Amino acid sequence: MERGTVSRIEVEIVKEMARQISNYDKVLEIVNQKDNFRSIGEVPLIPWKSTALSHGIPGICMLYGELHAHFPEEGWDDIGHQYLSILVNEIKEKGLHTPSMFSGAAGIGLAAICLSQRFTYYNGLISDINEYLAETVPQLLTEFDQRQVCMSDYDVIEGVSGIANYLLLFQEDKAMGDLLIDILKYLVRLTEDIIVDGEKVPGWHIPSQHQFTDIEKKAYPYGNFNMGLAHGIPGPICVLSSALIQGIKVKGQEAAIEKMANFLLEFSEKEQDSLFWKGIISFEEYQYGSPPNAVNFSRDAWCYGRPGVCLALVKAGKALQNTELINIGVQNLRYTISDIRGIFSPTICHGYSGIGQILLAVNLLTGQEYFKEELQEIKQKIMSYYDKDYIFGFHNYESMEGEEAVPLQYVGLLDGAVGVGLGVLNMELGSKTDWTKALLI
């Protein structure tokens, strides 16, 4: 079978998914089934949150926006408009509670932009979102400077790295540009050294009381340093680097990027010729001044592990015009694709679709087709999860404690069918909207 035929089949599968998702009542019925509510340890898995980009309507809007951009005569924008109307009603009823990318205003704004046909429509909604950001983000930045750091202060999921990547779309808007500068200055300050238990450490140190779970609080009594793209310093690296590449610069920005990138390299673990990264470096490991003695990481994914870290290194290398960093990122991505570990889902966050988007991003950043064959392999892995008897086509798979991976019926961008669909479209046709901004790409 010729590749063109395969491509048409894969795109048609995404279109069929989009047709099935068009019935909102059916979506709610499926995602809210009892079996979808699980926990990993003390962390509950959230199958649906209507206003959240991670698990709700904004991601669905992105899918229809992207489909319309590729197939403008097929009516996908009409379905997207219906969903955006539902989303606006949900906001009116429940309000906005966070400016973040994956739970709040920035993600909603980005979804509206993806449907807007290059700002032709929905400018009123986008303006309202931006006004909300202009009101809330400065208050948060002031609060951050008055206490110890939380991951959700700076990360892409809940923090200002995600918001900043949204603001990069508004270079001509003075208010949004000024807000972006304030965030960049905060991220630079985050790299200044602080004193913890008599030890000088980087300012992105997360104290014990600000860990996500009680288990982590007990495991890291002196705190730690997060190394994942979703919650760690690769996120700020990506944002600071993207801004620099776009010509947006604040004092200390280059030094901040370099300091964080060097930290990633210093606390990597070498196995033969490949580098690995744990999700977390403990305070004690930092004190010893060396990487951990044993490779101990959870997976090779967008959220944690080699792919996300390598994306950050390549972005840093391009921003700093440092070919060594670019080469380290590219080479270790190659090693990763030849030996992917801990991945058993087709999704974005910790699945094959997320890896695929990073490979595409690195190709675009470098202007080289480093991963042409590897992208075909990743796409084949994603399609191997397609279930023609499942209404949304692709399950999310999660590994519960003591269990094998179980299929879950998720729809959202991070862990659901929408993220798989958008990823496949990008790998087949390229991206015509800005949905990948959510991933720091």
Swiss-Prot record:
It holds the Pfam family LANC_like. InterPro entries: LanC, LANC-like, Subtilin_biosynthesis_SpaC. Gene3D superfamilies: 1.50.10.20. One of its GO terms (biological process) is peptide modification. Could be implicated in the processing or the export process of the subtilin lantibiotic. To S.epidermidis EpiC and L.lactis NisC. This is Subtilin biosynthesis protein SpaC. The lineage of its organism: Bacteria, Bacillati, Bacillota, Bacilli, Bacillales.
